[in-house]
């Protein structure tokens, strides 16, 4: 199996190269999952860690633990996402592709409490 991905999307976690497409390919097969995207989030110890964003198919719910178990069964431990985020929809650019830069920007903004 050979995964082809954009070099700028590659995540370097503790010296290991992680290609988001590899994680996305596995996560897309999880029950109830419609769309997936993986981006890197800065980590003070490891450099970057992968974060998986998923959306649910209409009428379905995404079981985050089931997605995590599927990923753990299929991927090396260092490739597992540090976090799985379920969104109503993924941001898209004007041509309809998933806007990964928007997801990276969202991760860079500190969460606020209500």
Q: Which residues does each predicted region cover?
A:
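AMP-binding/adenylate-forming catalytic core of the ANL superfamily
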Residues: 1-79, 88-91, 96, 102-105
């Amino acid at each position: 199996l050979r995964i082809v991905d954009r070099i700028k999307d590659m995540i370097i976690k503790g010296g290991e190269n992680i290609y988001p497409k590899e994680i996305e390919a596995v996560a897309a097969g999880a029950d109830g999952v419609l769309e997936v995207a993986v981006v890197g989030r800065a980590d003070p110890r490891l450099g970057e860690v992968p974060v998986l964003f998923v959306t649910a198919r209409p009428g379905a719910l995404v079981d985050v633990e089931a997605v995590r178990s599927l990923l753990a069964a299929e991927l090396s431990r260092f490739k597992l996402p540090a976090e799985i985020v379920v969104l109503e929809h993924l941001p898209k650019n004007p041509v309809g592709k998933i806007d990964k830069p928007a997801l990276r920007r969202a991760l860079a903004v500190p969460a606020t409490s209500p």
